[in-house]
Amino acid sequence: LGMIDIRPGQGTYISGNEANFFVIPLSWSLFMNGNQTESILEVRDLLEVKAAYLAADCVDDRALNRLYDVSHKIHQAYVEQNYKKFLDADLEFHSSIAECSGNTVIYSMLQTISNLMRHVSETGMIDGRQLQEIYEEHQKIYGLILAKDGEGAAEAMEEHMKRSKVRYNYR
């Protein structure tokens, strides 16, 4: 399950990744308890908003550079109107914000939820208008994070999450 690290010839150790102590049981619980889409989305919303808030205080150059790179990928995919590239970059965008939050538990939980939700989405984006909306929402969030406006980034992320539920027909 990732909570114990077995090293042949050396012994058995408790994993150094403390985030696994939360994430692995969460993954199994969600998997075993069937369809909990609404509950998962509520937790995702809370984590995404908090991650955006914390990301505004990010001082990790590597994480900030990744966020920049992903924002550039989103821009390129938008210009090309390449839906697949855009959706892949969308997942990376949210992941990089979680990384910028500096909270490994938030990051790990959002990765787990993202993997679960990838299989739950009933429709994806269906038109260029939605692509533009998401692009503009991401640009706003990214700009507020760069401006070190945690409150603004959190509000923009909250609005983005609300709109995403409608776009992806989550119920």
What role is predicted for each listed range?
Residues N65, R129-Q132:
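Short helix-capping and inter-helix turn/linker motifs at the boundaries of alpha-helical repeat units
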Residues K162-R171:
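Short arginine-rich
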